[in-house]
């Protein structure tokens, strides 16, 4: 056991960042080195490395900076400058949480644009695959229909700190994360197109 590395990981985890750990007693989802997470409807385990014979992965990633989104959302408020002191929100989180539904709608509007970009890009990839322009696809190693279009998420710790939250195991922080990740999860399912020939499947990637 590398005790020095263990202590480093424990220290960083205690601060709420830098390292990501995903564990599951019931493997009903995908997890890869790039932290792709997506529920599996058939309750089976698959590896994104392809070593199990299951071909999965991402054909494209668009990353959203949650910190930027939260601050841009607050900039839509009337006299928003009055609510910022020393670069952070100057009002209790309970007040902000009352506008969660508005922030959710703001995030959904951004996600709707992201899905359009993803669909347009993957449509181009499908056309290139049909034209036999990908040697790996021609050889049967990869199929575009098996690949996900991924939405990366960064800056959620910084967004929480901007709102005056402690990045730790506490109710307020977890409520904020549930809002962000829950909204993305719902919209991924809602906007996925399960076409037999040209499916468009979305998942999310949490980047520490």
Task: Provide a role label for each language-model segment.
Residues 158-166:
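Well-ordered alpha-helical scaffold segments within catalytic/enzyme domains
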Residues 1-145, 166, 170-208:
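Conserved catalytic cores of very large enzyme subunits
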């Amino acid at each position: 056991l590398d005790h020095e590395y263990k202590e480093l990981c424990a220290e960083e985890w205690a601060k709420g960042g830098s390292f990501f750990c995903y564990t599951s007693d019931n493997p009903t989802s995908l997890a890869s080195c790039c932290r792709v997470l997506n529920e599996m409807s058939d309750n089976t385990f698959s590896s994104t490395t392809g070593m199990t014979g299951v071909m999965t992965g991402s054909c494209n990633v668009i990353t959203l900076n949650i910190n930027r989104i939260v601050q841009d959302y607050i900039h839509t408020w009337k006299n928003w400058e009055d609510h910022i002191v020393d670069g952070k929100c100057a009002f209790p989180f309970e007040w902000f949480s009352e506008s969660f539904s508005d922030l959710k709608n703001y995030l959904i509007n951004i996600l709707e644009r992201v899905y359009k970009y993803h669909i347009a890009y993957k449509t181009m990839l499908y056309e290139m695959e049909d034209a036999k322009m990908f040697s790996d696809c021609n050889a049967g190693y990869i199929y575009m229909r098996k690949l996900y279009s991924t939405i990366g998420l960064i800056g959620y710790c910084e967004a929480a700190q901007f709102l005056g939250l402690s990045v730790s195991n506490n109710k307020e922080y977890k409520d904020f994360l549930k809002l962000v990740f829950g909204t993305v999860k719902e919209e991924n399912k809602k906007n996925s197109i399960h076409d037999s020939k040209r499916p468009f499947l979305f998942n999310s990637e949490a980047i520490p």
